[in-house]
Amino acid sequence: MIGRLRGTLAEKQPPHLILDVNGLGYELEVPMTTLYRLPSVGEPLTLHTHLVVREDAQLLYGFAGKRERDFFRELIRLNGVGPKLALALMSSLEVDELIRCVQSQDTSALTKVPGVGKKTAERLLVELKNRFKAWETSPAMFALVPNQPDGPAPVNTAENDAVSALISLGYKPQEASKAISAIKEKGLSSEDMIRRALKGMI
């Protein structure tokens, strides 16, 4: 099991990135909440990881901190929740926000996540309530190298990357394009576009 990787951020193509560890490039998929905390390409980066082994592939998921990684592991233990849905949940809401939804049994935020209807949200919250009684919310999130923007990407490229990232989270192409097109500010990075689009959707 690969539990943590430390190296240099070689590429980022939301929601994927490549981490160069001593010349070996690891491709990881990360939730958007981790993506927002990434340093610039070429900067050092440490990620906590979870490896999923399937018959046709080995998939590596990366997280800003151990607490976030552990939450992901709890989610995929639930009935009907795979890595894709777990990442969609964690991309739309911070871990503390998800825990507060569990504590208050509030389905409204969860039902806005692609693939989560009212009945599914209710079931997830009931199952999670027992699992997370010992968890505490904390304003201090996960330690990671502060984001250092490497300059705005060309608008078309950034927009395309942002739309592709939303589609990978389960949003329909038309929904993704509409959400990105609604952002009026120019010169934003794909990460900033994704963050604003997700806030608007939730």
From Swiss-Prot:
Molecular function (Gene Ontology), one example: four-way junction helicase activity
Cellular localisation: Cytoplasm
Keyword Ribonucleoprotein part of the UniProt annotation: no
Region (Domain III): 154-202
InterPro entries given in the database record: DNA_helicase_Holl-junc_RuvA_I (IPR013849), Hlx-hairpin-Hlx_DNA-bd_motif (IPR003583), NA-bd_OB-fold (IPR012340), RuvA (IPR000085), RuvA_2-like (IPR010994), RuvA_C (IPR011114), RuvA_C_sf (IPR036267)
GO biological process: DNA recombination; DNA repair
Domain II: annotated span: 65-143
GO cellular component: cytoplasm; Holliday junction helicase complex; Holliday junction resolvase complex
Keywords on record: Cytoplasm, DNA damage, DNA recombination, DNA repair, DNA-binding
Gene3D superfamilies in the record: 5' to 3' exonuclease, C-terminal subdomain (1.10.150.20), DNA helicase RuvA subunit, C-terminal domain (1.10.8.10), Nucleic acid-binding proteins (2.40.50.140)
Family as reported in the entry's similarity comment: Belongs to the RuvA family.
Role played: The RuvA-RuvB-RuvC complex processes Holliday junction (HJ) DNA during genetic recombination and DNA repair, while the RuvA-RuvB complex plays an important role in the rescue of blocked DNA replication forks via replication fork reversal (RFR). RuvA specifically binds to HJ cruciform DNA, conferring on it an open structure. The RuvB hexamer acts as an ATP-dependent pump, pulling dsDNA into and through the RuvAB complex. HJ branch migration allows RuvC to scan DNA until it finds its consensus sequence, where it cleaves and resolves the cruciform DNA.
Entry protein name: Holliday junction branch migration complex subunit RuvA
UniProt organism field: Pseudomonas fluorescens (strain Pf0-1)
